[in-house]
Amino acid sequence: MFERKIFSQHYEGAVKPFKIIGNVYFVGCIPASSHLIDTGDGLILIDTGYEDTLFMLVDSVYRLGFQLSDIKYIIHTHWHSDHTAATMGLVALTGAKTFIGHKDAENAKTYFVPDEVLRTGDRICLGNTEIDILETPGHTKGCISLFFNTEANGKTYRVGMFGGAGVNTLTPGHYEYPDCVADYLNSLKQLRQENVDVFIGNHVWNNDTCKKGELLLRGEKNYFIDADIWHTFLNFCEQRVKNVNGI
């Protein structure tokens, strides 16, 4: 679990789109995740992926029975190309409003011009969904994490995403910015204060997205529902960044 694979190209392949739980869907590729939230008044998309996987995302939206025009908001967890490079094309197709953490806004202009910037305590509301924003710097200076509720089987589940778990920018000689490691460790402390029932990743390796999705599509148990895996993953992230930095 939590194995980070290194790919020789931007993407390894397509993933059949599927409903994770409630109004939350996976529409990403391997290795970069994208998620749709059906708010009842339009779709919220979390991360757009690579420019050369835009066709996969568009196909996934249609396969799930939605229209591109349903996408109203696009939220980006951070500015790196595997989460933002398809945004300009998707905005041209949808007219969606774009959001990113305020400290990543300038770098994001490499790929698109954000409409709104986000800070801790901000809440994005559309239809039946309210997404709470937490700044979690480290992987990038403006990385954000997201938390919201979804309903399924007569229950309310808290969904959470850590917006930047990767340590490629936290490795000696490759730091994203000064003090990024200290920021990352502090972000983990903040994230541990959140209770999460359904952990979604912004890369498929974060939470075994593909394996769990395949089981769901076969009608088996929903392994995305797990109140323990959030903290297990955060502990893994802490140990990994300490290992690569000799802490």
Enumerate the language-model features and the residues they cover.
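Short, basic/low-complexity N-terminal boundary segments at the transition from targeting/disordered tails
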Residues: 1-16, 97
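Conserved beta-strand hairpin/beta-sheet module of binuclear metal-dependent hydrolase folds
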Residues: 10-64, 145-167
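Short Gly/Pro-enriched turn/cap motifs at secondary-structure boundaries
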Residues: 15-16, 25-27, 113-116, 135-139
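Short, flexible loop segments at the rims of nucleotide/cofactor-binding pockets, characterized by
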Residues: 22-26, 49, 74-77, 175-180
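Divalent metal-coordination and catalytic microenvironments
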Residues: 23, 37, 47, 57, ...
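Active-site HxH/HxHxD metal-binding segment of metal-dependent hydrolases
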Residues: 24, 52-55, 61-125, 224-233
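Structural recognition of the beta-strand scaffold that forms the well-ordered cores
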Residues: 26, 44-46, 72-76, 97-101, ...
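Metallo-beta-lactamase
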Residues: 43, 50-52, 123, 130-232, ...
